[in-house]
């Protein structure tokens, strides 16, 4: 008999949900994380009384009622609605592209006028077979929106011009012909009052957690403690990169406290011109409607990823997809180990989908 039923590698959302379900099923778990904190990339920390999203903006949204009810056991959610704005050389546009955006851009008032304007620009460009992201975007929304709101921002995000990016990156661009600035088409949306860390803490309540523990550096000793392993770290690192490293995009943040109560009037402002080096500025207090005397902002920079950097977004292209498929075969053949989460499955996961996946796996595993 080993000391624990499950060793859970990673105290992020996937690991915490699995731990919670295992505890309910009477199992004993040990959760470890190589960072000095729980909650993975949804970690929030208080600065000047403001919950700061250390790894970028996280806005919970879902259409899955069961997942919504699940998270509400661990936190009370506020009514925050994601309505980012774009700043293009001092011109402010609402996102996602909607009637407010078109009115500002062209002075059009009705949906019919906006549609006509977009169609006119698409026709003028005459693109029938888009060869790259630039042509694809223009064929979907016309030249003006592309030039002001897509070109510079997307180029910064990917570290190369849109003419060098494949067309398939944007299969569609959400265009709305209503005056609605709600970014997500989700039934349920909000931010947990008091931040995400407190929510994950509640999920892990009653489960042993050890921080600053690097699983891959001490694998054999840690494996000896438990019957099974739930691994939520990078799948390629688990196998010693034996097939090569999967690629990611990384993000870098410059966070500062400002002596003003309101810096930009919105939680998220995207800088869509090519000249501004950062992609967006997050003003954290607006996620929880804060009235503190000071404010905390984070400038977000997109960065090429190299081994050792924080991996954020999987690069979903054919090459990395094929490499992950090979790693998945190795993972499926690994006895006594469950691979899950954003890094374990090399997948861009919204929070609700991570919870869904962890609940599904836990239900099968613990039945």
Please place each PLM-identified region on the residue numbering:
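Short, well-ordered alpha-helix to beta-strand connector turns
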Residues: 4, 26, 207, 225-227, ...
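N-terminal Rossmann-like FAD-binding beta1-loop-alpha1 element of flavoenzymes
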Residues: 4-31, 362, 366
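Glycine-rich FAD pyrophosphate-binding loop
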Residues: 20-48
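Short catalytic/ligand-binding loop motif for oxyanion handling, primarily in non-cytosolic enzymes
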Residues: 39-41, 88, 94-95, 146, ...
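Dinucleotide-binding Rossmann-like beta1-alpha1 core, especially the glycine-rich loop
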Residues: 48-123
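Active-site/ligand-binding neighborhood in enzyme catalytic cores
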Residues: 89-93, 99-228, 232, 236-239
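Mid-domain catalytic core of redox enzymes
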Residues: 215-330
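C-terminal catalytic lobe of FAD-dependent flavoproteins
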Residues: 310-367
